[in-house]
C-alpha cells in the first residue's frame, strides 16, 4: 500500500495518463541495462547488448520495457493493494527468474528519471516525491515473495 495524499494521487494519475508507454518503457529498461550493466544477465537472450546504442535500439528491450510500463500503469489502479496487484510478478521474478529484488528499486529510480526527462518542468518536485513513493511501493510489492 502506498500512502498518497489526494493531491499526490492526482499528480501521479494525471502524469501517467500522458505517458507514452511504448517509448518511455523501452527507454527506461534500456537505461537500466546501460547504467547498471550487471542487470543484463537477466536479458542475455535479448541478443545484442554490447553497447549503449545496441541496447537502446534493441527491439526486445523496447518490447519488454513496454510490458514493464504497462504493468506499472496497471498497478496504479491498485495503489491500495500493490502486493496483491504484483503477486504473480513477484512470484515469477523470485522463483523462476531469481532476480535480485534490489533491481526493482533501481528500475523505479530510472522510471522517475525518464519521466523527469520527458515532462520537464511539469514533473515538479511534488510530482517526483509522489512518484518516488509509488515506485518504492511497487518495488516493495515485487520483492514481497522474497520475504
Swiss-Prot record:
Tissue: Red blood cells.
Record organism: Trichechus manatus
Family label: Belongs to the globin family.
GO BP terms: hydrogen peroxide catabolic process
Pfam family, one: Globin
UniProt entry tagged with the keyword Iron: yes
One GO molecular-function entry: oxygen binding
Key words of the record: Heme, Iron, Metal-binding, Oxygen transport, Phosphoprotein, Transport
Coiled coil: none
UniProt entry tagged with the keyword Phosphoprotein: yes
Chain positions with Phosphoserine modification: 51
Residue span(s) of domain Globin: 3-147
Name of the protein: Hemoglobin subunit delta
Entries under InterPro entries matching the protein: Globin, Globin-like_sf, Globin/Proto, Hemoglobin_b, Hemoglobin_oxygen_transport
SUPFAM superfamilies: Globin-like
Subunit structure: Heterotetramer of two delta chains and two alpha chains.
Residue sites binding heme b per the record: 64, 93
Annotated GO CC locations: blood microparticle; haptoglobin-hemoglobin complex; hemoglobin complex
